[in-house]
Amino acid sequence: MRICGWQGLVCKEFVCSSEETESLQAAYAADKASSRTTVSYEEYMRRWKANARGVDLNYNFAANWEGINVSLTHPSANGYKGTNPLSEPESQAIANLIQGTGFNAVINYHAMGNVIYWDTQNNQKAAESKALANAVHGYSVLGSKGVGGLKDWLQQAAGIPGITIEVGRSTCPVSFSEYPAIWNQNKAVPATLGYYVATH
């Protein structure tokens, strides 16, 4: 199997060692073999959501981690939770930053859905998180029972209010044509967060 298109160039020239390139190809082969994907390798790479090691950081935090995607045991473009919570340097860095800095609230951005999620299982900061979600205008506000994500960990383990804003209406990756509308919808969010923290 060969990498084609701009992904191959990026992997070869800027990002991936030959071992990492082989890991990406192995993830694709494993997902094809288990019928998790039927798309071409190029499309698989275009839709890639995980880190370079094939761990989906949306599932790598210690919030009901044990029950996440238990049948997916190999690195993948999406959905693989890793070998243990915070197994990835990116997740560790975010957790360390939040724990070491004393955040009062966190807004977590994701791409796809045009909604705000504010809830999770065993949410220690439900009222505060819902108030923060309601303060951000222009989105539908939904509860969720998410697991393994940053918001879920913040609310369950760290005791910090948090929301996830899902930007964009198209499938991931969000089309560049949506960026102006996303910017207009979100340019006041930092001030909204600051006001929320100052008044709560």
Ranges and model annotations:
Residues 1-121, 126, 174:
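Active-site/substrate-binding loop(s) of hydrolase catalytic cores
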Residues 50, 78, 134, 144-145:
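Compositionally biased, low-complexity repeat tracts
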Residues 127-143:
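Catalytic cores of secreted/periplasmic or lumenal enzymes
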Residues 29-36, 136-141, 193-199:
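Short C-terminal domain-edge/linker segments immediately following a structured domain
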